[in-house]
From Swiss-Prot:
Gene: mtgA
PANTHER family named among the record's database cross-references: BIOSYNTHETIC PEPTIDOGLYCAN TRANSGLYCOSYLASE, MONOFUNCTIONAL BIOSYNTHETIC PEPTIDOGLYCAN TRANSGLYCOSYLASE
Record-listed E.C. numbers: 2.4.99.28
Protein family per UniProt: Belongs to the glycosyltransferase 51 family.
The protein's role, per its UniProt record: Peptidoglycan polymerase that catalyzes glycan chain elongation from lipid-linked precursors.
Protein known as: Biosynthetic peptidoglycan transglycosylase
Keywords: Cell inner membrane, Cell membrane, Cell shape, Cell wall biogenesis/degradation, Glycosyltransferase, Membrane, Peptidoglycan synthesis, Transferase, Transmembrane, Transmembrane helix
């Protein structure tokens, strides 16, 4: 095989990998499809296995939905996949040399979980943004939340809220209390180091804040809990 043929095959493979997620997004809109994340696939390939028990949105405690939205994406019901105001603020702070916090919305996190890889990079973010916009356009907000809560990582080999609720609190996701829901929500950014069932003082304080915000969430969660 000459260099030109090899280069052509590599380019075609990369193009196929770039296009594939956009073909899967409308497929994942179908309610009977249960997507898996790239981390789950990695666990399978490395023979580690994982625990994920898919549950429909109606079988998940509304307290958990409220807590996750208030912790991860308070504008979920109002943006089209990307919170451009928050994104602009993060970019401005970065250019000024100030510390920044993430601007990843729930659609962006879902796109990353389903199609991309962990770790911060401009390349991943550049791929993530259009995928989030496409998914938010094709899926309903309820479907987006259902997929997100069923593929999110909540510990080593623990994926989805049902497996998380059973692993950390020995109860189904439908029966999570306000505090349990808040603890699971605030552990999402770093589920390996933040253990919902063994929270330190800092995690307890953060969970208390999210618990209060969840109680007052009102119209902020209407697109999912109407």
């Amino acid at each position: 095989m000459d260099f030109r043929t090899l280069a052509k095959r590599i380019i075609m493979t990369l193009l196929a990998l770039l296009i594939l997620p956009y073909l899967l997004i409308p497929v994942y809109a179908l309610p009977f499809i249960r997507p898996v994340s790239t981390l789950m696939l990695a666990d399978l390939v490395t023979l580690q296995g994982y625990d994920r028990r898919w549950v429909p949105l109606e079988d998940i405690s509304p307290r958990l939905v409220q807590s996750v939205m208030m912790s991860e994406d308070g504008q979920f019901c109002f943006h089209g996949g990307v919170d451009w105001n928050q994104m602009q603020s993060v970019v401005s702070n970065a250019l000024d040399g100030a510390s920044t916090r993430g601007a990843s919305t729930i659609p962006m996190q879902t796109a990353k979980n389903l199609f991309l890889w962990n770790g911060r990079s401009f390349l991943r973010k550049g791929l993530e943004l259009p995928l989030a916009i496409a998914a938010d356009f094709v899926w309903s907000k309820k479907r987006m939340m259902e997929i997100y809560l069923n593929v999110a990582e909540w510990g080593p080999g623990i994926y989805g809220i049902e497996a998380a609720a059973q692993h950390h609190f020995k109860i189904p996701a439908a029966k999570l209390s306000s505090r349990q829901a808040a603890l699971l929500a605030v552990s999402l950014p770093n589920p390996i180091d933040r253990v919902a069932s063994k929270p330190g003082r800092g995690l307890q304080r953060l969970a208390g804040l999210i618990e209060r915000r969840a109680r007052a969430s009102g119209g902020y969660v209407g697109c999912v809990l109407d």
